[in-house]
Protein backbone atom coordinates (compact mmCIF):
# COMPACT_ATOMS: atom_id res chain seq x y z
CA UNK A 1 0.00 0.00 0.00
CA UNK A 2 2.95 2.30 0.53
CA UNK A 3 3.85 2.06 -3.15
CA UNK A 4 0.25 2.69 -4.23
CA UNK A 5 0.01 5.72 -1.95
CA UNK A 6 3.23 7.19 -3.30
CA UNK A 7 2.17 6.54 -6.89
CA UNK A 8 -1.09 8.43 -6.29
CA UNK A 9 0.89 11.23 -4.63
CA UNK A 10 3.14 11.34 -7.70
CA UNK A 11 0.16 11.54 -10.06
CA UNK A 12 -1.35 14.30 -7.91
CA UNK A 13 1.94 16.20 -8.00
CA UNK A 14 2.25 15.86 -11.78
CA UNK A 15 -1.34 17.05 -12.22
CA UNK A 16 -0.57 20.11 -10.10
CA UNK A 17 2.54 20.84 -12.18
CA UNK A 18 0.29 20.72 -15.25
CA UNK A 19 -2.19 23.08 -13.56
CA UNK A 20 0.73 25.39 -12.73
CA UNK A 21 1.71 25.40 -16.40
CA UNK A 22 -1.79 26.37 -17.47
CA UNK A 23 -2.29 29.02 -14.79
CA UNK A 24 1.16 30.62 -14.79
CA UNK A 25 2.51 30.08 -18.30
CA UNK A 26 -0.30 29.57 -20.84
CA UNK A 27 -3.17 31.40 -19.12
CA UNK A 28 -3.78 33.89 -21.95
CA UNK A 29 -3.91 31.23 -24.68
CA UNK A 30 -7.51 30.54 -25.75
CA UNK A 31 -7.27 26.78 -25.16
CA UNK A 32 -6.24 27.40 -21.54
CA UNK A 33 -8.67 30.16 -20.61
CA UNK A 34 -11.55 28.26 -22.16
CA UNK A 35 -10.62 25.28 -19.97
CA UNK A 36 -11.17 27.52 -16.95
CA UNK A 37 -14.49 28.90 -18.30
CA UNK A 38 -13.02 32.34 -19.00
CA UNK A 39 -15.20 33.88 -21.70
CA UNK A 40 -12.83 36.27 -23.49
CA UNK A 41 -9.23 37.18 -24.11
CA UNK A 42 -9.85 40.44 -22.25
CA UNK A 43 -11.04 38.52 -19.18
CA UNK A 44 -7.99 36.26 -19.41
CA UNK A 45 -5.74 39.33 -19.44
CA UNK A 46 -7.63 40.83 -16.49
CA UNK A 47 -7.28 37.67 -14.40
CA UNK A 48 -3.73 36.84 -15.50
CA UNK A 49 -2.01 37.98 -12.29
CA UNK A 50 -4.48 36.05 -10.12
CA UNK A 51 -3.98 32.89 -12.16
CA UNK A 52 -0.21 33.38 -12.12
CA UNK A 53 -0.20 33.45 -8.31
CA UNK A 54 -2.57 30.48 -8.04
CA UNK A 55 -0.36 28.51 -10.43
CA UNK A 56 2.64 28.90 -8.18
CA UNK A 57 0.55 27.78 -5.21
CA UNK A 58 -0.16 24.57 -7.12
CA UNK A 59 3.50 24.18 -8.08
CA UNK A 60 4.61 24.49 -4.45
CA UNK A 61 2.10 21.81 -3.40
CA UNK A 62 3.49 19.56 -6.14
CA UNK A 63 7.07 20.17 -5.02
CA UNK A 64 6.13 19.32 -1.43
CA UNK A 65 4.60 16.02 -2.52
CA UNK A 66 7.58 15.18 -4.75
CA UNK A 67 10.12 15.95 -2.03
CA UNK A 68 8.04 13.84 0.36
CA UNK A 69 8.04 10.89 -2.03
CA UNK A 70 11.80 11.16 -2.44
CA UNK A 71 12.30 11.41 1.33
CA UNK A 72 10.24 8.25 1.96
CA UNK A 73 12.31 6.31 -0.57
CA UNK A 74 15.58 7.81 0.68
CA UNK A 75 15.03 6.46 4.18
CA UNK A 76 13.47 9.45 5.94
CA UNK A 77 9.87 8.26 6.26
CA UNK A 78 8.84 10.71 9.00
CA UNK A 79 9.89 13.70 6.92
CA UNK A 80 8.56 12.14 3.73
CA UNK A 81 5.13 11.19 5.00
CA UNK A 82 4.74 14.56 6.70
CA UNK A 83 5.32 16.28 3.36
CA UNK A 84 3.14 13.84 1.40
CA UNK A 85 0.23 14.15 3.85
CA UNK A 86 0.57 17.92 4.13
CA UNK A 87 0.80 18.51 0.39
CA UNK A 88 -1.81 15.97 -0.69
CA UNK A 89 -4.08 16.98 2.18
CA UNK A 90 -3.91 20.60 1.01
CA UNK A 91 -4.65 19.50 -2.57
CA UNK A 92 -7.65 17.55 -1.32
CA UNK A 93 -8.97 20.42 0.78
CA UNK A 94 -8.57 22.81 -2.16
CA UNK A 95 -10.62 20.39 -4.27
CA UNK A 96 -13.34 20.36 -1.60
CA UNK A 97 -13.42 24.16 -1.60
CA UNK A 98 -13.70 24.08 -5.40
CA UNK A 99 -16.57 21.57 -5.19
CA UNK A 100 -18.35 23.77 -2.67
CA UNK A 101 -18.09 26.71 -5.08
CA UNK A 102 -20.84 25.36 -7.30
CA UNK A 103 -22.09 22.43 -9.33
CA UNK A 104 -20.22 23.54 -12.44
CA UNK A 105 -16.93 22.88 -10.59
CA UNK A 106 -17.67 19.33 -9.46
CA UNK A 107 -15.87 17.67 -12.38
CA UNK A 108 -12.76 19.80 -11.93
CA UNK A 109 -12.84 19.18 -8.18
CA UNK A 110 -13.07 15.43 -8.74
CA UNK A 111 -10.11 15.52 -11.12
CA UNK A 112 -8.10 17.68 -8.72
CA UNK A 113 -9.02 15.78 -5.56
CA UNK A 114 -9.20 12.08 -6.38
CA UNK A 115 -5.49 11.24 -6.54
CA UNK A 116 -4.53 13.16 -3.39
CA UNK A 117 -7.46 11.52 -1.56
CA UNK A 118 -6.22 8.08 -2.58
CA UNK A 119 -2.65 9.00 -1.61
CA UNK A 120 -3.74 10.10 1.86
CA UNK A 121 -6.14 7.21 2.54
CA UNK A 122 -3.75 4.52 1.29
CA UNK A 123 -0.85 6.16 3.12
CA UNK A 124 -2.75 6.16 6.41
CA UNK A 125 -3.80 2.53 5.93
CA UNK A 126 -0.23 1.54 5.10
CA UNK A 127 1.15 3.20 8.21
CA UNK A 128 -1.41 1.80 10.67
Please state what every model-predicted region is.
Residues 54-67, 115-116:
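Core segments of transmembrane alpha-helices
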Residues 67-96, 100-114:
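Transmembrane helix-loop-helix
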Residues 24-32, 73-77, 103-107, 124-128:
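Transmembrane helix-loop junctions in multipass membrane proteins, especially transporters and channels
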Residues 25-47:
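Cytosolic, membrane-interface loops and tails of multi-pass inner-membrane proteins
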Residues 113-128:
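Small-residue-rich segments of transmembrane alpha-helices in multi-pass membrane proteins
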Residues 7-10, 14, 56, 89, ...:
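Hydrophobic residues within alpha-helical transmembrane segments
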Residues 2-26:
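N-terminal signal-anchor transmembrane alpha helix
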Residues 42-60:
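Interfacial helix-start motif at the membrane-water boundary
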